[in-house]
Amino acid sequence: MNGTEGPYFYVPMSNATGVVRSPYEYPQYYLAPPWAYACLAAYMFFLILVGFPVNFLTLYVTIEHKKLRTPLNYILLNLAVADLFMVFGGFTTTMYTSLNGYFVFGRLGCNLEGFFATFGGINSLWCLVVLSIERWVVVCKPMSNFRFGENHAIMGVAFTWFMALACTVPPLVGWSRYIPEGMQCSCGIDYYTRAEGFNNESFVIYMFVVHFLTPLFVITFCYGRLVCTVKEAAAQQQESETTQRAEREVTRMVILMFIAYLVCWLPYASVSWWIFTNQGSEFGPIFMTVPAFFAKSSSIYNPVIYICLNKQFRHCMITTLCCGKNPFEEEEGASTTASKTEASSVSSVSPA
């Protein structure tokens, strides 16, 4: 074996030389130099420094401005809450453990950090699925009389929480487990071992199919149909400048959404699956650490792409930050008016 398996941990280094120690008790500087751990801590500090204000501001601005309290924005608020789960439950812990070079909070701390970080990530992932379904239903109108209302939004939020709990609770009760991963400073699902009594194999397959491939398929289908619908609407109104502008805007948003999804989750899912299907193969701690931290960065991508590019929200945010006045009032007002015109031209295809 090219790694060292112990009680509730797996260190990606052979213990032939006798240097491997428990990641709950000793610094892991034999895996990477201290400066590498310092870089991880600095990166987590950056995510906290950016992720907390942006997501908190999203919550505050939406609550402060009544016109933003729409059913669709319930999902966007839930997205911000999911990102804050990652910031407080995962990033703060990982920053502190990286500064120490090992997981100082022990087994209980590993369970809590793994749960909160995974819960936030999976919850936000299913929020994106609900958003894509909402956009598909509203724009493509597969059900002609359907109107997305408050009850639908509440059901959507409840669905994201149910799916997140369905992924994060089982490792706490014996179906798989949370263990330190990569450089042993953060915890995640055990993709590394086939430890007796935990049924890791079945859980990893379940997680990969239900919580990665399924969201990927749904998002691809919904946004693919959205692009086709916008193109059809533009083709019928070729002389309408606002329609053409709406097509470009929605297409850009779709591309950004899809790229962000892939950047955040494809590397992590791919590496996890490779490790799972090639157990016993040699790999270094950085091999798992880098994609895991790509996934954590979704707490920044989400509010920027899904909220800050929304003209109406941006106007309200600037007004809030500038104590009730928007110094770009004329420009923002014109953009908002144009956005409304575009929305009416192509059946409300604007991002939100």
From Swiss-Prot:
Gene Ontology terms, MF aspect: 11-cis retinal binding; G protein-coupled photoreceptor activity
Family, as annotated: Belongs to the G-protein coupled receptor 1 family. Opsin subfamily.
Region (Disordered) residue spans: 331-352
Amino acid composition bias (Low complexity), ranges on this chain: 334-352
Membrane topology: Multi-pass membrane protein
Subcellular location: Membrane; Cell projection, Cilium, Photoreceptor outer segment
Positions marked as site (Plays an important role in the conformation switch to the active conformation): E113
Gene Ontology cellular-component annotations: membrane; photoreceptor disc membrane; plasma membrane
Cystine residue pairs: C110-C187
Motif position, 'Ionic lock' involved in activated form stabilization: 134-136
Residues passing through the membrane, by range: 37-61, 74-96, 111-133, 153-173, 203-224, 253-274, 287-308
Organism of origin: Psalidodon fasciatus (Banded astyanax)
Modified residues (N6-(retinylidene)lysine): K296
Gene name as annotated: rho
Example of a GO biological process term: G protein-coupled opsin signaling pathway
Functional note: Photoreceptor required for image-forming vision at low light intensity. While most salt water fish species use retinal as chromophore, most freshwater fish use 3-dehydroretinal, or a mixture of retinal and 3-dehydroretinal. Light-induced isomerization of 11-cis to all-trans retinal triggers a conformational change that activates signaling via G-proteins. Subsequent receptor phosphorylation mediates displacement of the bound G-protein alpha subunit by arrestin and terminates signaling.
Keyword tRNA processing set for record: no
Protein name: Rhodopsin
